[in-house]
């Protein structure tokens, strides 16, 4: 069971003021320790648990680590994008651009909602000015770490399923249902039934 390996604490974010605000709100619980952030609307399916891959890199570098995915150029405007220098599957991040307009970056590597962060992120968030819609963006604090060469990106060997939309949630349910021996036949039968109607 999870309880044997981790302490899970729910922290209420008083208003939707951005991912940076959510991370900053958790500061009293993370204290002076490194911690992981996993966005629940992104499910990563692959041979190696994504957070484990990030922790292995963190153990070697001691710095902040972010999971990355390569997306089509037309999709970069929807994500935080990283630029930098590649060393194998690791990117020494030099620049972070939050949702760049099309054509403003050559990079197609975006954050996928998995991070290992140092406690230093909290004071960076505290001094970050809110952006659009009054939201505090984690990417602004990550950009500061990148400017200090203290952020590593890792190209994850995983498929990302975005459950943030109704169609994305349906796709994730189908992909996961079809991948399990105990549910695959039932999911196929459901698809066939609704496909015929």
Features from the language model and the residues they span:
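Conserved beta-loop-beta/alpha segment of the NTase-like Rossmann-fold superfamily
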Residues: 1-86, 119, 125-128
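Intrinsic disorder at enzyme termini
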Residues: 187-197
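Catalytic-core segments of class I nucleotidyltransferases/pyrophosphorylases
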Residues: 36, 55-59, 86-189
